[in-house]
Amino acid sequence: MREPDRTPIQRRDILTGKLKQDSGGESRFLHISSAIVTARPDRAADLARHFATLPGTEVHAVQGAKIVLVLEGASVGEIRQPHGAISVMEGVFSANLVFEQILPADEREALS
């Protein structure tokens, strides 16, 4: 196993979603965010099934009009893309990110 790259993260890299990559072109980080989606109660179950098909998106709970999601990606941009798509879907009233964590990519295996 190779030694992980521990180069410090720059604030600008986080804000722009351009965290440095390793020499193989893969992101050195795993971004994990949770979101609460509020939807029409009569559409929540169908929307949750659809959200589960989106890359990097897991549905953790559906209760009434509320849907709890976890979004994972190699960058902030990879999280923003499905979040943006979800927020404008018919039947969705709001989609709010409520948590974000950035982990070194070498910790992915520990989460699996």
UniProtKB/Swiss-Prot annotation:
Pfam families: NapD (PF03927). GO terms for biological process: negative regulation of protein transport. InterPro entries: Chaperone_NapD_NO3_reduct. It is found in: Cytoplasm. GO terms for molecular function: signal sequence binding. One of its GO terms (cellular component) is cytoplasm. Interacts with the cytoplasmic NapA precursor. Belongs to the NapD family. PANTHER family: CHAPERONE NAPD. This is Chaperone NapD. It comes from Paracoccus pantotrophus.
